[in-house]
Amino acid sequence: MAKIGVTETVLRDAHQSLIATRMRTDEFEGILEKMDKIGYHSLECWGGATFDSCLRFLDEDPWERLRLIRRKCPNTKLQMLFRGQNMLGYRHYADDLVDYFVKKSIDNGIDILRIFDALNDVRNLETAINAAKKYGGHVQAAISYTTGPVFDIEYYCHYAKQLEDAGADSICIKDMAGLLTPYGTYDLVKALKETVKVPIQLHSHYTSGLASMVHLKGIEAGVDVIDTAISPLAMGTSHPATESMVAALQGTEYDTGLDLKALTEIRDFFNPLREKYLADGLLNPKVLGVDANTLLYQVPGGMLSNLISQLKQAGKEDKLDEVLAEVPRVRKDSGYPPLVTPTSQIVGTQSVFNVILGERYKMVTKEFKDMVAGYYGKTPCDIDPDFRKKICGDEKIIDCRPADLLKPELDTFRNEIAEYYEQEE
């Protein structure tokens, strides 16, 4: 039996990171049966931005994509990314909707649900975790990894224990920004293995150039499964190359058991797609390199490009360094939220406003106000009451689970689209 499991991300996070989730089903359908024979721990193939992208940009049915992958890959576990109470959207949804979406995901072929919350607020995961357990799915609860004064090993061990107690079958260290360092990873994994009994999976983006070393030190510390991407869509803002990690571990006590020759067939299939994406501009060579700003400013690569875009639209591109210096200040003011969807957009946009208007918090976005008021959940650090008053004014402050304020939504949506749909998913 393989010592280290490998989750292949090419069908979801690899192309989400490199080409804005634009890979079409008919582009990868032809290789699925061969991928099913590789022996991966799992195929990450659904959730995250794929659902939105199928509907908004690709004119595809995301449910039919999932059913097709399930038919072609009967022997491999299929995995999705699920944003807890946010599901696959950008706001909190009612419990009945979350429960039903989880049920339908499992019914249509998902085996493993990687469930995370942007604020690491376990309350925002409980409904999704309970639903996945109820309908027979494997719950992989994810820690949104970030850096800052409160984010020490003790913080992560405490959160991991909360996740295990909530019902997690495994735990993923989700390093969405490529902020993990090799030796920091070793210490973190060692501590987590002493704290929880469930398997640990490691997910780290190559943005800062450290992810392969992070994987290796994580494995030495006891990680059970790693996320990789087949080489044509690896590296840069994606993940370490599958073949490289398999070769690095071959013949050691950590041998993955995967066949490099078999992986060559997978690589050869995706190579022409890479060339096509480069030729049509979908794959920008800039995202394939190392972005040292990630290490310097602790800002995820995707967030950095978004900040540049906002400044360009305002004709204030020369203000980038000021905005990058403002981000950690805004993050501190708002309770140190990890910078991942949707909090990265919320903090980033507010930082841009603070700089280009010449006065901090002269204008406050609705989303920033809601986050400070508690409508996204509890922030990792307490927010100063005077700052909260300044931002929120007379708006109601909440400390309950945000979804507790939401009425059931499922029947309302059913009624709204009753005349249009043939089946519910």
Sequence positions of predicted segments:
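Catalytic cores of alpha/beta
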Residues: F151-L163, S208-D224
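Non-catalytic positions within long, well-ordered alpha-helices that form the structural scaffold/packing
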Residues: D36, I106, E164-G167, I219
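N-terminal amphipathic alpha-helix/helix-capping segment at the start of soluble metabolic enzymes
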Residues: M1-I19, L66, R71
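C-terminal helical cap(s) of enzyme catalytic domains, especially alpha/beta-barrels
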Residues: A234-T256
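Glycine-rich phosphate-binding active-site loops on the catalytic face of alpha/beta enzymes
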Residues: I115-A118, D175, A221-S238
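Hydrophobic faces of well-ordered beta-strands that scaffold small-molecule active sites
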Residues: V6-L11, H41-C45, T76-G84, D111-R114, ...
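Active-site beta->alpha loop and helix N-cap motifs at the rims of alpha/beta catalytic domains
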Residues: G47-E164, I171, T181-P182
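Terminal or standalone catalytic/regulatory effector modules within metabolic enzymes
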Residues: D36-C54, N284-T294, Q298-E425
